[in-house]
Amino acid sequence: MARSHPLERYRNFGIMAHIDAGKTTTTERILYYTGKSYKIGEVHDGAATMDWMEQEQERGITITSAATTCLWKADEGKGPEHRLNIIDTPGHVDFTIEVERSLRVLDGAVAAFDGVAGVEPQSETVWRQADKYKVPRMCFINKLDRTGANFYYCVQTIIDRLGATPAVLYLPIGAESDFKGLVDLVNERAIIWKDESLGAEFFYEDIPADLADKAAEYREKLVELAVEQDDEAMEAYLEGNVPDVATLKKLIRKGTLNQAFVPVLCGSAFKNKGVQPLLDAVVDYLPSPLDIPDVQGINPTTEQPDSRATSDSAPLSMLAFKIMNDPFVGSLTFARIYSGTLTKGSYLNSVKDKKEKIGRMLLMHANSREDIEEAFAGDIVALAGLKETTTGDTLCASNAPIILERMEFPEPVIELSVEPKTKADQEKMGIALSRLAAEDPSFRVSTDHESGQTIIKGMGELHLDILVDRMKREFKVEANVGAPQVAYRESLAKPVDVDYTHKKQSGGSGQFGRVKVSVAPGERGSGITFIDEIKGGNIPREYIPSVEKGMREAAENGHMIGFPIIDFEIRLTDGAYHDVDSSALAFEIAGRAAMREVAAKAGIKLLEPVMKVEVVTPEEFMGDVIGDLNSRRGQIQGTDSRGNAQVVEAMVPLANMFGYVNQLRSFTQGRAQYTMQFSHYEEVPNNVAEEVKAKMA
């Protein structure tokens, strides 16, 4: 089976957006018009094809990025057929990890905004993440049929809040309930949709007279932005020659790929208007896999930087970006192929230096699947039955190993204890949690040594809620869930020196190890550094890693109330060993005991996670919101107005944010919303530290 579409006709893109900007609806419509799902699924009634997990259907938010393949011919079907791989990204802040992960494998993105609100807090977060991965993107201002929708205000928010340069390609005709079509500035015509054909049919007419001046003004702005991309076009334009449509499209494409500006489109996916122009723009302006730089990695044998060209003949390299449990196929690993050709039955090398056999290979459509024998560079495939691969791993040809950059995953800030209700649930719970942790690297599972409880940790209350819920539904595990706990940390109060000797004599060979360490608290976020300053072999080389291991393990178990001690520097300055009695174990025990002595001598300060909280509220509740945040030990960082709403930014300890969503809804009548993400660890005030100690004791 040969390649069906040349690489330049591939578009791997995602739709990124704030919770309610209509991302799933837009994806649904794309699938409908590209002919893959024949009945339009509405999120309002929980049937969208992309949202295939039960919880998503209930909550109406997208949780997992399903990858879907569809085909599209631009220019009303006259253009060459393109293959679109759409990666659905979640828009809720507890799932930013999923967003990071999908951005890593996209070539381009469409940012969808709500036509009333414009750029919202979460849109900014996702936009910054896309900046980090240098993803070329365009904007789709959606929901223009809503009361209060204002296209021009939204364009202004792209400038004010994202600092981006918008290149407007379409203007809306009519607003709110009278919204009926678009002015196409590139082709200088109006597009009107027919409601009775579910928006599948539309016709062209002249630009309405009342919009003629506005259209001329916006087209001129667009042309000026475009000609800046090319010296010849610029000179011609200054001499009074306006580029023709084909040239204009080329220049817009160039500017989009260079991220000089972002094309702006508009419509209402729910009312089936503006989706076809959006698809045409994806084809015309977003990058193909050939337009993005070669994927970078490291050669594991030489540890030198290496790269792979996007071509079927290059050695195979691919990145696993998502693992999901599919009720019919079992575990599915979604992977993006950057280079080479993948055939069913072949063996690949995983980062862990294990061999993986490719069994079933599937192309996913929201929830139907097609078996394939072969896949090529640029494809996004789902692989069944991989044993060793986790999210973020590279799979590559065994004769040409490469490790594509690892993704970075944030540390979890909130934890819960879960206990199985019955003995039968115990075993199932273990399996369920390990599967869920394999799917989602921002979710951790551990056992509390003292109480024997299972602790799960994640990025926020919603994140853990959904995971516990999935455990019940997918794995049929009934569990009692404890109250959420804050992931506190401990830190050393002052620098200390410790000289510790571990000695044990019990007939035969004993144990002996002596270590001298200087330990000092470091900057917040610096982690634990271990510096070996042993001179003259006082501790043999092979025992030094054991000292470090012992000290790190003791730090992990904490001292005051059992939370890990973080951010300090250990200098191993001296020590002693015995020819017969010394061993790796003896030095590990010495390291562990030395660390405990360090903690006792230096004294411990308790640290708590502080969250960056942003509340968007109508003006009249502003006083209540600020008062409430202050009562939660919050520090107000600033306020700002956004359209007709006010934004309050504050730093608030996580311990005081539990249940905030319900409280906020009650005193703002459900009209305010907030986002919260981890900012940093900070020392806990003494009175609070005493309370925490008493509670944990």
From Swiss-Prot:
InterPro entries (UniProt xref): EF-G-like_DII, EFG_II, EFG_III, EFG_III/V, EFG_IV, EFG_V, EFG_V-like, G_TR_CS
UniProt KW keywords: Cytoplasm, Elongation factor, GTP-binding, Nucleotide-binding, Protein biosynthesis
Protein's GO biological process: ribosome disassembly
Pfam families in the record: EF-G_D2, EFG_C, EFG_III, EFG_IV, GTP_EFTU
SUPFAM superfamilies in UniProt: EF-G C-terminal domain-like, P-loop containing nucleoside triphosphate hydrolases, Ribosomal protein S5 domain 2-like, Translation proteins
One Gene Ontology term, aspect cellular component: cytoplasm
Domain tr-type G stretches: 8-290
Subcellular localization(s) per the UniProt record: Cytoplasm
Entry similarity comment: Belongs to the TRAFAC class translation factor GTPase superfamily. Classic translation factor GTPase family. EF-G/EF-2 subfamily.
Name assigned to this protein: Elongation factor G
